[in-house]
Design a protein with these regions (language model features):
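Short alpha-helical "packing" element that flanks the helix-turn-helix/winged-helix DNA-binding module
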Residues: 36-40
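Short helix-to-turn junction characteristic of helix-turn-helix DNA-binding domains
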Residues: 12, 43-47
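Central "turn" residue of the DNA-binding helix-turn-helix
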Residues: 47-48, 59
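Residues within the alpha-helical elements of helix-turn-helix
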Residues: 42, 57
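Helix-turn-helix DNA-binding elements, focusing on the entry/boundary residues of the two helices
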Residues: 51
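Charged, amphipathic alpha-helical coiled-coil/dimerization segments
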Residues: 20, 48, 70-130
């Protein structure tokens, strides 16, 4: 085997791109990408949270989180305000139109999830999620 074919990182990135493209195509009618859907879904669950907290929940750095929020803010799906307790911190909340977009996208996401599990088998999909959740990197 060639080193490239043995590289865990490259194999994971290739699979990630294929899966992301699949979910993006299923969510396309809503105008959302799966990364944006994840943000809206998390805000729907958590309510208003700081940018830093949202970034931690999604395992993203603050700069990337900001870049991901900008289109959602332009679409008026999220509202960014200064924190009432710390003027340096920004709080992100889901707007009414963001909630409606989340509801529409959730239907399509559930279909994509079912299609993915049908194609790969429910046990394989569950094992994949479990493996990825418990994956250790380094020591």
């Amino acid at each position: 085997m060639k080193p490239f074919e043995q590289c865990n990182c490259m194999a994971l990135r290739r699979a990630s791109r294929r899966i992301t493209n699949f979910y993006d195509s299923k969510l396309a009618p809503t105008g959302l990408r799966v990364t944006q859907y994840a943000i809206l879904a998390l805000l729907g669950k958590l309510g208003g949270v700081s940018v830093n907290s949202l970034a931690r929940h999604l395992d993203l750095d603050r700069t990337t989180m900001g870049k991901n929020l900008r289109p959602l803010e332009r679409m008026r799906y999220v509202k960014v305000t200064s924190s009432p307790t710390d003027g340096r911190s920004r709080t992100i909340t889901l707007t009414n139109s963001g909630g409606a977009a989340l509801k529409a996208a959730a239907r399509l996401w559930r279909r994509a999830q079912a299609e993915f599990e049908s194609a790969n088998g429910g046990a394989v999909a569950r094992a994949l999620r479990s493996t990825l959740a418990n994956l250790k990197v380094g020591r």
